[in-house]
């Protein structure tokens, strides 16, 4: 199901006021709200709220009523967020991506690998994750840091997409990794990429909606859980995800817009996890938490 963005284009000051209005209107609900700078010199900003298509009619009605009362000149616009369109670009348009010690590249760029690179070969295809998106690159940076500095005996990549993050963990350390996704096409693509990278024996791929699979109890609890999904489902699954984390374990979360980070951190703090750090990439954040 598509994700929808409703937004108003305005000045920075007005965008902040509209953000406050939306926060008051939807404060107890799981809709992502944020502001984005479009043009610094011209003072053009956007105030946005994100929702799934099934919620659009109700959210749009409430936003329009609120804007009409407080910002009668504001014009509400709509955008359908592409789910995988960017992934299917021609291979020629995808340059190698460096994140930490990792080099994520397509088969056409094997000559770009340098000595010391941890190379992951992922061609553009049907599943999310070639390293070019800020969320994937951010996760790779934090994975590199966590796996080098903490004891990690097993890992879970929840919402694996192309499998790039599971492959990264396995290439860093010879530990078992469970890679799951709700989409069977993604699971198939991930399994193919695991084989392409020569580590098929170390990664188990499974199609599983949320945590509704015996695979989690069979392979967990986990020292490292990575979930590069979206803020709303991440918030919802916080209590359940925390039950699958081993004592002293780490969680890496992404798919989160900068303005959503505090809600996500609050949800996981409520699940007794501690915020370690947040890194920023192109308007997206990756959050590292652990269990003390």
Swiss-Prot record:
GO terms for biological process: methylation. The keyword Calcium does not apply. It catalyses: L-lysyl-[protein] + 3 S-adenosyl-L-methionine = N(6),N(6),N(6)-trimethyl-L-lysyl-[protein] + 3 S-adenosyl-L-homocysteine + 3 H(+). This is Ribosomal protein L11 methyltransferase. It is an enzyme of class 2 (transferase). It holds the Pfam family PrmA. Its EC number is 2.1.1.-. Coiled coil: none annotated. Belongs to the methyltransferase superfamily. PrmA family. The gene is prmA. It is found in: Cytoplasm. GO terms for molecular function: protein-lysine N-methyltransferase activity. One of its GO terms (cellular component) is cytoplasm. The keyword Transferase applies. It comes from Rhizobium johnstonii (strain DSM 114642 / LMG 32736 / 3841).
């Amino acid at each position: 199901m598509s994700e929808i963005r409703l937004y108003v284009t305005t000045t920075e000051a007005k965008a902040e006021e509209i953000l406050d209005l939306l926060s008051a209107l939807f404060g107890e609900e799981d809709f992502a709200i944020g502001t984005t700078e479009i043009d610094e010199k011209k003072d053009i900003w956007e105030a946005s709220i994100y929702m799934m298509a099934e919620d659009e009619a109700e959210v749009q009605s409430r936003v329009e009523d609120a804007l009409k009362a407080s910002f009668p000149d504001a014009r509400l616009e709509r955008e359908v967020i592409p789910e995988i369109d960017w992934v299917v670009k021609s291979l020629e348009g995808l340059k190698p991506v460096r994140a930490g010690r990792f080099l994520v590249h397509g088969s056409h760029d094997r000559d770009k690998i340098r000595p010391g690179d941890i190379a992951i070969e992922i061609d553009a295809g049907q599943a999310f994750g070639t390293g070019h998106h800020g969320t994937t690159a951010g996760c790779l940076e934090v994975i590199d840091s966590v796996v080098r500095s903490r004891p990690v005996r097993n890992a879970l990549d929840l919402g694996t997409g192309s499998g790039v993050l599971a492959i990264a963990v396995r290439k860093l350390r010879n530990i078992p990794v469970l890679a799951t996704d709700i989409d069977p096409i993604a699971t198939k693509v991930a399994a193919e990429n695991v084989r392409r990278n020569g580590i098929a024996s170390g990664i188990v791929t499974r199609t599983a909606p949320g945590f509704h699979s015996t695979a989690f109890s069979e392979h967990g609890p986990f020292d490292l859980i990575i979930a590069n999904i979206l803020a709303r489902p991440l918030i919802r699954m916080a209590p359940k995800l925390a039950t699958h984390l081993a004592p002293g374990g780490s969680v890496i979360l992404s798919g989160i817009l900068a303005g959503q980070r505090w809600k996500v951190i609050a949800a996981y703090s409520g699940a007794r996890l501690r915020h370690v750090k947040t890194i920023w990439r192109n308007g997206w954040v990756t959050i590292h938490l652990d269990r003390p």
